[in-house]
């Protein structure tokens, strides 16, 4: 944010300045440190407005979110052609899950259900469109909804959102331990060791 002109500072390739949507996760964790229910009540309309803006601006008919891959902050990764970044979509699921949890804190069953439903919708789409059984990994999608076969650290974000079932999670853990993919001396490389890049 530029204080001299009160304007957001954005990148050419990310004009909306979208980043990973993690505000509900942050508020949930803050609540568990402070137990300030009033803050949740006050911030919830802002969080809802933010989620609605993301839906209105970036959600596509396939149920996934098409954002610039720069939104992930991983601009050093070879993700050219990525239109549906797996990390952003996993974060949307994660944020929806925490929005539901915040609804529970407020004893708002309707709100909780709305975001729980959203979570499962995104989870289903990430699993059906971004998961590859052959390689046991989650991938970004291109504009044609085809998987980009570049294994990046972004493919592990679905685990944080509890998207994979036990079998898929085991495949991801195997990649973390596999010296041919992500099991390197310096853990969690941006790219898989067998990357074509």
Regions found by a protein language model. Give the residues of each.
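Aromatic side chains
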Residues: 31, 50-53, 115, 138, ...
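Short amphipathic alpha-helical coiled-coil/interface segments
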Residues: 47, 112-130
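Short, contiguous, pocket-lining structural segments
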Residues: 15, 80-94, 111-114, 118, ...
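Aromatic-rich carbohydrate-recognition surfaces in CAZymes
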Residues: 1-64, 85-89, 93
């Amino acid at each position: 944010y530029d204080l001299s002109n009160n304007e957001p500072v954005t990148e050419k390739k990310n004009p909306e300045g979208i980043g990973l949507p993690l505000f509900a996760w942050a508020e949930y964790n803050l609540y568990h440190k402070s137990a300030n229910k009033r803050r949740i009540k006050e911030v919830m309309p802002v969080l809802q407005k933010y989620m609605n803006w993301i839906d209105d601006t970036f959600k596509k008919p396939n149920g996934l979110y098409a954002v610039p891959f720069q939104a992930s902050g991983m601009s050093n990764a070879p993700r050219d052609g990525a239109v549906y970044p797996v990390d952003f979509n996993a974060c949307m699921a994660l944020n929806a899950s925490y929005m539901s949890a915040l609804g529970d804190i407020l004893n708002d069953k309707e709100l909780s259900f709305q975001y729980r439903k959203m979570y499962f919708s995104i989870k289903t789409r990430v699993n059906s469109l971004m998961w590859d059984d052959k390689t046991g990994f989650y991938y970004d999608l291109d504009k044609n909804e085809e998987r980009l076969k570049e294994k990046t650290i972004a493919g592990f974000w679905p685990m944080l959102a509890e998207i994979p079932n036990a079998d898929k999670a085991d495949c991801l853990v195997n990649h973390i331990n596999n010296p041919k993919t992500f099991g390197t001396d310096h853990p969690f490389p941006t790219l898989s060791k067998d990357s074509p890049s």
